[in-house]
């Protein structure tokens, strides 16, 4: 109160002198009229603003890369500011002239900012996913809600770079140390470490360990009356949600469905299988999705083919006369989804572009596409159409309800569950599980599941969501269950990965395959050990980072031409004689 009174008294004195014409506004004799005098002392100079920005970014980085809650950034930022005050960062005891230099650390800091953004958005940073989406194409993506977050991240990163540049220019101690800091930031960036590890493996390893484990999928024998196949991918609906202590009843409807199914517990996620396209390829082709990289024939165009070098579930069933359909509410142009299914035996590939024009309520869509209650209604119609045809059929369906970060709960769920707060992923998990159970029960009532194997699986483990801390607190595994007339309901504890789904599904359909294997997968209905069981998840991931031969197999046919192009073959003119030509020729004289 005393300081405020003194400020007001000083201001009154200055105003009186000004009115008499004895002082000039904002002169040193009248400093009380300067705007900075009315601000708290830390706010009168850019020093503390710059240090605060750096501290908040440090705190956010620590909170994002550890299991600290978001508010954990506050003590980290506070500790940074205390150190800054103790060591007078930005205001050295022995000032040096300000030098207009550009810090060496700007690029390393920006790369760390990119890594933190990816970690905050997706939970686990998968460089394979980044490279694949860049090559496969990202048009018609539904992540519009992430654009705003990306803009905020970019602006805050620019503010951080400006703040750090200011600190280096005004404090000579930071100028001396920041080159070492740049090296430390580069060496410690996990994203760059992964790239460097991959490059070193290409040079030092033979890169063919997984290739030697690969078994080409082959059907040796087929049942007399092969069953139909309904494969339901539930977006990000991992089996981890079945833990009632952590997640309540969010997974309860799938648990109820599992009472009449073969339920597999312990289906883990290996590297390069942790996003939708990678999860579908792992479960249908028995391989991880290793990006094409330099094997892509045109680096500036989207992929024209997706894993053309291996046979997948669709190829095997198509060769056996199956009519195959893919259905999903999102665009099939995103991440090469449509290309993959069309190239691997599917007759009909139906996504947002094909399904949305026929909707009765065209406004009832989300940023990705159709809601799942609409998609499942159309799925029933497609199954009726397939049933009217002769021969076996297969239908692959991909949901959207559980998509990170918040999910897209359908209208039917909102009417049943009440208001959605827009954040709680467990609301969306319950919705997805209930919709899947309702679809299966509806198909059973209509008799559309006779002689049909139903597969319910998560495409991959979820990315960062509101329940992230609870999810990463223990072991995580994927959803995988089989429902069929010939299958005895039971629970099987396995050590497996999503690559084991392909041979398991084939054997559940009654097909005989070579050594119970297909791709890198092993049938979980057999006694054969899986790669995860034999070698462990860590070893498998380490081998995957070293692999080059399997990558070449996956993308066989996309290699750019090596060396100079071959010279064109000379054109040989072909002369064709007609009877008329022969008549004009002089007859050969006889001796």
Regions found by a protein language model. Name each.
Residues 3-6, 10-14, 19:
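Low-acidity, Ser/Thr- and Arg-rich intrinsically disordered low-complexity segments
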Residues 217-234, 239-591:
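Solvent-exposed soluble domains appended to multi-pass membrane proteins
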Residues 198-213:
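Alpha-helical transmembrane signal-anchor/signal-peptide segments
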Residues 23-33:
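Short, Lys/Arg-enriched N-terminal segments with co-localized hydrophobic residues
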Residues 5, 35-202:
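Transmembrane and membrane-interface helices of multi-pass
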Residues 1, 23, 52, 73, ...:
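Detector for intrinsically disordered, low-structure N-terminal pre-sequences
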Residues 90-93, 97, 211-215, 437-440:
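Short, motif-level signal for alpha-helix interfacial/capping segments enriched in acidic residues
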């Amino acid at each position: 109160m005393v300081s405020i009174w003194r400020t007001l008294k000083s201001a009154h004195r200055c105003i009186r002198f000004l009115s008499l014409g004895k002082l000039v506004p904002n002169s040193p004799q009248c400093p009380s009229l300067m705007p900075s005098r009315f601000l708290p002392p830390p706010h009168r100079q850019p020093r503390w603003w710059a240090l605060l920005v750096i501290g908040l970014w440090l705190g956010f980085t620590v909170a994002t890369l550890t299991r600290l809650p978001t508010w954990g950034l506050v003590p980290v930022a506070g500790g940074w500011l205390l150190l800054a005050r103790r060591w007078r960062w930005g205001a050295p005891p022995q000032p040096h002239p300000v030098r207009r230099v550009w810090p060496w650390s700007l690029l390393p800091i920006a790369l760390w900012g990119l890594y933190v953004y990816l970690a905050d958005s997706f939970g686990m940073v998968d460089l394979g996913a980044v490279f694949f989406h860049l090559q496969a194409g990202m048009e018609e993506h539904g992540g519009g809600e992430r654009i705003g977050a990306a803009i905020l991240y970019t602006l805050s990163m620019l503010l951080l770079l400006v703040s750090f540049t200011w600190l280096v220019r005004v404090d000579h101690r930071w100028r001396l140390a920041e080159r070492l800091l740049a090296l430390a930031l580069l060496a410690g960036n996990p994203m760059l470490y992964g790239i460097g590890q991959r490059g070193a493996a290409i040079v030092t390893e033979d890169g063919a360990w997984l290739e030697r484990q690969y078994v080409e999928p082959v059907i040796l024998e087929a049942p007399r009356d092969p069953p139909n196949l309904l494969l339901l991918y539930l977006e990000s609906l991992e089996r981890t949600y079945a833990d009632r202590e952590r997640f309540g009843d969010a997974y309860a409807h799938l648990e109820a469905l599992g009472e009449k199914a073969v339920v597999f517990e312990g289906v883990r996620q290996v590297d390069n299988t942790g996003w939708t396209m990678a999860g579908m390829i792992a479960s249908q082709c028995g391989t991880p999705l290793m990006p094409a990289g330099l094997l892509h024939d045109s680096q500036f165009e989207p992929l024209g083919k997706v894993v053309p070098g291996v046979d997948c579930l669709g190829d095997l069933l198509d060769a056996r006369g199956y009519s195959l359909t893919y259905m999903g509410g999102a665009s099939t142009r995103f991440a090469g989804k449509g290309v993959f299914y069309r190239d691997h035996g599917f007759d009909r590939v139906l996504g947002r572009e094909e399904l949305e024009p026929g909707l009765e309520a065209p406004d009832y869509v989300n940023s990705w596409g159709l809601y799942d209650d609409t998609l499942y209604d159309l799925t029933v119609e497609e199954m009726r159409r397939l049933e009217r045809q002769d021969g076996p059929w297969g239908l692959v369906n991909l949901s959207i309800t559980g998509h990170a970060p918040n999910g897209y709960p359908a209208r039917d769920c909102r009417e049943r569950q009440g208001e959605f707060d827009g954040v709680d992923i467990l609301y969306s998990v319950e919705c997805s599980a209930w919709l899947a159970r309702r679809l299966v029960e509806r198909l059973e009532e209509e008799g559309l599941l006779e002689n049909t194997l139903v597969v319910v699986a998560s495409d991959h483990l979820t990315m960062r969501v509101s329940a992230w801390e609870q999810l990463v607190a223990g072991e995580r595994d994927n959803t995988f269950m089989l429902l069929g007339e010939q299958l005895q309901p039971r629970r099987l504890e396995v050590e497996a990965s999503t690559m084991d789904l392909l041979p398991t599904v084939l054997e559940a359909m009654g097909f005989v395959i070579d050594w119970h294997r297909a791709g890198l997968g092993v049938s979980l209905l057999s006694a054969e050990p899986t790669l995860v069981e034999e070698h462990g998840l860590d070893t498998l991931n380490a081998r995957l980072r070293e692999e080059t031969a399997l990558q070449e197999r996956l993308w066989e046919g996309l290699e750019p031409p090596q060396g100079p192009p071959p010279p064109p073959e000379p054109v040989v003119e072909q002369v064709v004689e007609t009877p008329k030509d022969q008549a004009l020729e002089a007859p050969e004289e006889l001796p």
